[in-house]
């Protein structure tokens, strides 16, 4: 593998370019804006983008967002979401909202998500792949004359067939009215339905219902308790203000490790007994004794 060497300031230049590409997307037509054009673009587009962001998802009949569309998510026309019209000075009043493809010569008039079967396109009932169909409304097959329009019986991970899902384009207010996450306002182009790291997972696997992803400051700054992971307890610095300091140091770290002679049941039983002792000591207001490091 070739080793890349950057000159002084090169890493910062790379970060600035990535920031530029996330904000501008495909709007520069492949030619970089000058610094003046870039600043003018941000003054014009960013307020509009923050106010009129559209959230795009692929929704099942049960109301679950099985797929949250992002900048790189492919459309039925095989072009990415970021290559479609996503910024509006005024949000259209008609529903559904059409997001036409901006690639020259493409017949796609509205963004339409189609799932993949692993890395391959799914098949229509005419036995041809999705990318063998026309992106024009009706989605007729280009490889046969019997197909009346793309219709796939591919089953989503939620248990519903693909044809029962809909590509939904909605505003922030419409999404909040349904109790769905909207995340934080970001200036980047074509963010679609992405609201956090958990948005990359499929709907049935998405455990973070907040959609923001990162825990709040209150959670991050909360004191380490006896119920936390042994690693957090071991790395917790001693506190002079807490009346019930946790025992830290090598003894705590050793206690959390499995001893060579211990089987599974003995290890978990020792961990359980140590936790019970720590909880009892905490209730009595005493300093927590360091856990035993002797073999049980």
From Swiss-Prot:
InterPro entries: Fam221a/b (IPR026755)
Region (Disordered): 235-263
Protein's organism: Rattus norvegicus
Family as reported in the entry's similarity comment: Belongs to the FAM221 family.
A Pfam family of this chain: FAM221
Top-rank taxon, per record: Eukaryota
Name of the molecule in the record: Protein FAM221A
Biased composition regions of type Polar residues, renumbered to the chain: 237-256
The gene coding this protein: Fam221a
């Amino acid at each position: 593998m070739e080793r890349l060497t950057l000159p002084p300031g090169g890493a910062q230049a790379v970060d600035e370019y990535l920031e530029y590409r996330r904000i501008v997307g495909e709007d520069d037509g492949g030619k970089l804006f000058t610094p003046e054009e870039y600043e003018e673009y941000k003054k014009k587009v960013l307020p509009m983008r923050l106010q009129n962001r559209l959230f795009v998802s692929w929704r099942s009949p049960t109301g679950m967002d099985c797929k949250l569309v992002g900048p790189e998510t492919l459309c039925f026309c095989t072009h990415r979401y970021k290559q479609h019209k996503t910024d509006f000075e005024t949000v259209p009043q008609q529903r559904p909202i059409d997001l036409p493809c901006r690639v020259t010569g493409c017949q796609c008039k509205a963004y339409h998500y189609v799932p993949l079967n692993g890395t391959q396109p799914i098949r229509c009932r005419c036995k041809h792949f999705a990318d063998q169909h026309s992106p024009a409304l009706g989605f007729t097959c280009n490889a046969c004359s019997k197909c009346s329009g793309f219709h796939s019986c591919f089953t989503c991970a939620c248990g519903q067939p693909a044809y029962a899902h809909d590509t939904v384009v909605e505003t922030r207010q419409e999404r909040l009215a349904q109790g769905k996450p909207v995340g934080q306002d970001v200036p980047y182009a074509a963010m679609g339905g992405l609201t956090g790291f958990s948005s990359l997972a499929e709907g049935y696997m998405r455990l973070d219902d907040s959609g923001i992803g990162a825990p709040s400051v209150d959670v991050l700054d909360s004191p380490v308790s006896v119920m936390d992971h042994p690693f957090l307890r071991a790395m917790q610095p001693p506190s002079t203000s807490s009346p019930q300091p946790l025992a830290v140091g090598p003894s705590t770290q050793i206690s959390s490790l499995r001893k060579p002679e211990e089987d599974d049941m003995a290890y978990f039983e020792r961990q359980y007994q140590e936790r019970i002792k720590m909880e009892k000591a905490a209730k009595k207001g005493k300093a927590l004794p360091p856990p035993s490091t002797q073999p049980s």
